Amino acid sequence: MRSLALLCAVLALSDGITRLPLERGKKLREILREKGLLHHFLQHHRYDIGTKFPHAFPDVLTVVTEPLLNTLDMEYYGTISIGTPPQDFTVVFDTGSSNLWVPSVSCTSPACQSHQMFNPSQSSTYKSTGQNLSIHYGTGDMEGTVGCDTVTVASLMDTNQLFGLSTSEPGQFFVYVKFDGILGLGYPSLAADGITPVFDNMVNESLLEQNLFSVYLSREPMGSMVVFGGIDESYFTGSINWIPVSYQGYWQISMDSIIVNKQEIACSSGCQAIIDTGTSLVAGPASDINDIQSAVGANQNTYGEYSVNCSHILAMPDVVFVIGGIQYPVPALAYTEQNGQGTCMSSFQNSSADLWILGDVFIRVYYSIFDRANNRVGLAKAI
């Protein structure tokens, strides 16, 4: 993983955009399964992707806090550095949240001790704010403080960035996650304590050619990319379809319907969807997800997950998301995944939220552009 830092130290190329490579790692779900701990985790921690998005509807928004983050299915990571001289951290680039945080050397939790920890005393540019920060998880609260320092993302140097330093991380299971922290790429309205997100500081400091970023996710361990300040046409074919952001908090859009076997099966009266790089699955209301699972032939196992017969995948139907009148089919090869034990799992997940979360399963099929200048999302068929 740390060898990735060399790749991340790329210069902004002549086309005026900056690329940061991502690595696809093993999900915590699979690590816990291999260690025989998944059943225990699911018994003791209510896992609900929908709790990550408490503010998806502005009419019920009262207090803006950092959204809940579920780490069970995060799988794409990149390397950034903080401080002078730089200290490297592996982070999830998460369009479903807006704060940056990493572990602090002041944290004695096992989860911190098993990851890279930021040492403020070793950075000549670090400034303490005296401010506290609490980030809520399905497994408990992450407590920390807020510091200010230089944050470098690929060749982009943000010299005055507020970020969270965790002093306590909840739950023994955080020991096993493959990333050190989170870098949120959502709108500023989601950020805890009014902290300006990293992307907004990049824009404010005129570091980007354009006020947008784009994401390509590969199924392979290497090859994924976040592109800051532009669009890389080598990652997609055909034209870009643009969809307006319906609520400027998450990267939230309006979806028309969901079709399986030419039948409208969910979201029949229209619904809201969030394009989220920090969730690997596609999640939606439980009744709709159950209908999709039934339509594609998935069966529930003892963990509450849904599995399919691996030999049937090529015959399984596409799940088609209709957005702005355009159909976006996701084939069975994209929405199923072998779990390493000879079983193929469905990547559709129940959620308590009355909205859809189009995570990495969807983004792997459609190159995604997050255009803040025009408050819109662009989708194009990924290579």
Swiss-Prot record:
GO MF, one annotated term: aspartic-type endopeptidase activity
Active site residues per record: D94, D276
The protein's Enzyme Commission number: 3.4.23.-
Signal peptide range in chain numbering: 1-16
Domain (Peptidase A1): residue spans on this chain: 76-380
Glycosylated residues in this chain: N132, N204, N309, N350
Disulphides: C107-C112, C267-C271, C310-C344
GO biological process entries: digestion; proteolysis
Enzyme class: hydrolase
Record keywords: Aspartyl protease, Digestion, Disulfide bond, Glycoprotein, Hydrolase, Protease, Signal
Coiled coil: none
CDD domains named among the record's database cross-references: pepsin_A (cd05478)
Superkingdom field: Eukaryota
Similarity field: Belongs to the peptidase A1 family.
Protein's recorded name: Embryonic pepsinogen
Organism: Gallus gallus (Chicken)
